[in-house]
């Protein structure tokens, strides 16, 4: 099995990228406006320890999806999880362009975008299933990730409020 056909590449890419965010977001927020329009970058979280909770939760999801994919030999599950991750990486580049500045996560995004595309292409070659399954699984995973992202930002905000006595 080659590196790019492993179901375990996605969690590794995720941790490499999110480590940059976890380390750099708090200091970046001290000197930069965190809003793009009405949307606040990084879910409004200002502390690395709280951000780490959200990163850990997402990492566990990626590990679970990779494990299930490995156990049932179903690469489409990892493909479906990699697509929102790729969009997340692209979003960092877009945010940096909009801000005309460095945004935490942009360096690893630039490094990882080509790697992630190659990874997706390798996994797609391994996926030999009906087209309807592609649509169902990809839509289900996108919806699950969107709901989870909203959920984890609410949880992180509440934890930050409680721990750092905000509000």
Residue positions per predicted region:
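Cytosolic, membrane-interface loops and tails of multi-pass inner-membrane proteins
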Residues: 21-45, 155-167
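Terminal transmembrane helical module of multi-pass membrane proteins
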Residues: 118-167
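Transmembrane helix-loop-helix
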Residues: 59-87, 133
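N-terminal signal-anchor transmembrane alpha helix
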Residues: 1-22
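Hydrophobic alpha-helical membrane segments
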Residues: 83-92, 103-123, 144
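Transmembrane alpha-helical segments that form the membrane-embedded catalytic/substrate-channel core
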Residues: 15-22, 85-96, 143-157
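Membrane-interface helix caps and helix-loop-helix hairpins in membrane proteins
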Residues: 71-75, 93-103, 126-128
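Core segments of transmembrane alpha-helices
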Residues: 51-69, 111-117
């Amino acid at each position: 099995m080659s590196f790019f056909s492993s179901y375990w590449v996605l969690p590794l890419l995720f941790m490499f990228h999110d480590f940059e965010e976890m380390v750099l977001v708090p200091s970046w927020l001290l000197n930069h406006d965190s809003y793009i329009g009405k949307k606040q970058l990084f879910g409004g979280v200002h502390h690395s320890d709280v951000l780490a909770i959200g990163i850990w939760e997402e990492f566990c999801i990626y590990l679970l999806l990779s494990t299930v994919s490995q156990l049932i030999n179903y690469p489409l599950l990892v493909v479906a999880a990699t697509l929102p991750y790729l969009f997340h990486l692209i979003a960092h580049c877009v945010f940096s362009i909009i801000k005309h500045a460095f945004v935490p996560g942009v360096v690893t995004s630039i490094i990882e975008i080509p790697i992630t595309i190659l990874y997706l292409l390798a996994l797609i070659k391994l996926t030999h299933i009906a087209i309807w399954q592609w649509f169902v699984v990809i839509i289900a995973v996108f919806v699950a990730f969107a709901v989870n992202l909203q959920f984890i930002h609410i949880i992180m905000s509440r934890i930050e409020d409680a721990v750092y006595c905000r509000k």
